């Protein structure tokens, strides 16, 4: 039995799943994937913003579609292409994996680059042979001067199937997700990408306020539940009313919609590659999906529009505060740090310099809705002083500055409880709920393979991150 990352064991093939000697000598039926007409134009639009970012990728092909997997600046990137997006999609046999790069200059995905073939008419992928030694052949047609389709034989590419591969895919429903427009996501990404002000905190407070802040910048939005007719929170109504005073357009720019916005949280991301990755992918508007209850919490950014590309960024496990679960793992021993006047920085990216409606008129010793103000879960370093709103953050003493080399010691993380304690006794044996990773894999030497197109280590089968994956 093969052991994969995370301590999970790959389930071996059953005797019924192992092909007989006669079956091994016979080829699988030819698999054919065709793009032409409106479907071809749709795929070209999906790849247009990606440019050359995904040319060197792993293509996982199955009966549900094609998954393009890559790593940009060390972060995992996924682009799912559902079988319904193709003009013809016929697949038989187990899931296959192909490296898209053919040589130093050409790739299976080069055909989808903008202006690569101005008169592109048809793209056809044919997979023949016996698994795991199948061959993929890509053929393309363009429009000739007389209007007829002509095949470019010199552009035909051939690729062999990978005999051994493993791809881990995050899966499950997000605990909280927020939908942001292009200007809203740009503000968030600019705040996260400040190299001199990391780490950055993502926080959803009980007052209905979603904030992204670090030592230099703060971006704040009013979070509302998707499809909610009216909010039951008085603080959300006050905040929304205050925003509407500046006009409906300003109110819309300051409001984000999502699901499970009642689940307050405070998480920290210490990696500044988010801005670089999303700029490389040319992501405009997108959805922030927070997976907070996993052993390794993460945030997934999924682009809106024709290219539903997603990038996954890991969060610091010891800096996750979840009030709605009644616990704060690791060093987060206090309640949620959602009081903006004390937890958030003072130098804001927002154009308005007025205090937010949730803070206006609040007593110094009381929090929102008359509750006693709790200390921030992640207090500032002792060497930092705050001045009047809009002032810079000034170090109190040079001796307290962080050295140029090395990083401050992270708080000790509490030991994670066993799977049986969190998800039930069946979870530790591969059943139950709570699974966060699905896997495609095949090991040629041991004969182990994923028993189905989508295999999960723990929990029921779910579309990873809502993707329609193979």
UniProtKB/Swiss-Prot annotation:
Polar residues composition-biased segments: 329-354
SUPFAM superfamilies: DNA clamp
Cellular localization per UniProt: Host nucleus
One GO CC annotation: host cell nucleus
GO function term, MF aspect, one: DNA binding
Source taxon at top rank: Viruses
Motif (Bipartite nuclear localization signal) on chain: 385-404
Protein purpose: Plays an essential role in viral DNA replication by acting as the polymerase accessory subunit. Associates with the viral polymerase to increase its processivity and forms high-affinity direct interactions with DNA. Facilitates the origin-binding protein loading onto DNA thus increasing its ability to assemble into a functional complex capable of unwinding duplex DNA.
Family to which this protein belongs: Belongs to the herpesviridae DNA polymerase processivity factor family.
Protein name: DNA polymerase processivity factor
Organism whose genome encodes this protein: Human herpesvirus 2 (strain HG52) (HHV-2)
């Amino acid at each position: 039995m093969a052991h994969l990352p995370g301590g999970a064991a790959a389930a071996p093939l059953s005797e019924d799943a192992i092909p007989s000697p006669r079956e091994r000598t016979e080829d699988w039926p030819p698999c054919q994937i065709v793009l032409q007409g409106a479907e071809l134009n749709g795929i070209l639009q999906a790849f247009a913003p990606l440019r050359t970012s995904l040319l060197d990728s792993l293509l996982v092909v199955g009966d549900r579609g094609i998954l393009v997997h890559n790593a940009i600046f060390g972060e995992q990137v996924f682009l799912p292409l559902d079988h319904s997006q193709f003009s013809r999609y016929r697949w038989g046999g187990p899931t296959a994996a192909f490296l898209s790069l053919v040589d130093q200059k050409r790739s299976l995905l080069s055909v989808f680059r903008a202006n690569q073939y101005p008169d592109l008419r048809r793209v056809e992928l044919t997979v023949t042979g016996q698994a795991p030694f199948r061959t993929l052949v890509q053929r393309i047609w363009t429009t000739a001067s007389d209007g007829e389709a002509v095949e470019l034989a010199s552009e035909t590419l051939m690729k062999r199937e990978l005999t051994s591969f493993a791809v881990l895919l995050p899966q499950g429903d997000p605990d909280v997700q927020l939908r942001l427009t292009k200007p809203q996501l740009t503000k968030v990404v600019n705040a996260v990408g400040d190299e001199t002000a990391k780490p950055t905190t993502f926080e959803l407070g009980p007052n209905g306020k979603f904030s992204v802040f670090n030592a230099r910048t703060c971006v704040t939005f009013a979070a509302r539940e998707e499809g909610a007719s009216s909010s039951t929170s008085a603080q959300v109504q006050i905040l929304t009313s205050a925003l509407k005073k500046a006009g409906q357009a300003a109110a819309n720019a300051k409001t984000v919609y999502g699901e499970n916005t009642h689940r307050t949280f405070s998480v920290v991301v210490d990696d500044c590659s988010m801005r670089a990755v999303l700029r490389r992918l040319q992501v405009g508007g997108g959805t922030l999906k927070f997976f907070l209850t996993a052993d390794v919490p993460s945030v997934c950014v999924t682009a809106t529009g024709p290219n539903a590309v997603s990038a996954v960024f890991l969060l610091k496990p010891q800096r996750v505060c979840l009030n709605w679960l009644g616990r704060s793992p690791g060093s987060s021993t206090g309640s949620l740090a959602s009081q903006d006047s004390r937890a958030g920085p003072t130098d804001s990216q927002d154009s308005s310099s007025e205090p937010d409606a949730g803070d206006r008129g609040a007593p110094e010793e009381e929090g929102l809705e008359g509750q006693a103000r709790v200390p921030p879960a992640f207090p500032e370093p002792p060497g930092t002083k705050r001045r009047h709103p809009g002032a810079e953050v000034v170090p109190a003493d040079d001796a307290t500055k962080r050295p140029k080399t090395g990083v401050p010691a992270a708080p000790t993380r509490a030991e994670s409880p066993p799977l049986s304690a969190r998800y039930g006794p069946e979870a530790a044996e591969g059943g139950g709920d709570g699974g966060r990773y699905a896997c495609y894999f095949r090991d040629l030497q041991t004969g182990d393979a994923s028993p189905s197109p989508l295999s999960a280590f723990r929990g029921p089968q779910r579309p990873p991150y809502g993707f329609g994956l193979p």
